[in-house]
Amino acid sequence: MCVEGDEHMFRIAICDDERQFRKRIHDILIEYMNENDILYEIDEFESGKDFISLGINLAKYDIVFLDVNMDELDGMETAQKIRKVSNDVFIVFVTAFITCAPQGRIQRRSYKIYSEK
């Protein structure tokens, strides 16, 4: 989805292997952006592998919401690969499984936000 204009447009990626959680994050973001008249573009990815396949183009995103627990390439591994391309992408980790959350790993790597789904 894209809302265009002359001002800065926030480019947001949602990377989660569960469709219902991608939709929930997407809906929350749309509501917030529209209420605050913020221009945005939101893209969704089913896996870390799909997102990383963008290569250098993943640096176009301002914010990436990453599920911590995904098959093939989990959120932490995906974040490491993002950092190899760009230090400017703001990463938000999300998870539905708080008991499995790698909070220490997130803090040690100086990522800023961690949120339960």
Regions found by a protein language model. Give the residues of each.
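Non-catalytic signal-transmission and effector/linker regions of two-component phosphorelay proteins
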Residues: 1-11
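CheY-like receiver
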Residues: 61-117
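Conserved acidic carboxylate
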Residues: 16
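Switch/coupling loops of ABC transporter nucleotide-binding domains
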Residues: 10, 40, 89
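Acidic, metal-coordinating helix/loop segments flanking the phosphotransfer/catalytic sites
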Residues: 26, 44-63
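Alpha-helical elements of the RecA-like P-loop NTPase motor core of helicases
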Residues: 23, 53, 102-103
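Two-component/phosphorelay signaling modules centered on CheY-like receiver
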Residues: 19-43
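Hydrophobic "anchor" residues on beta-strands that sit immediately upstream
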Residues: 12-13, 63
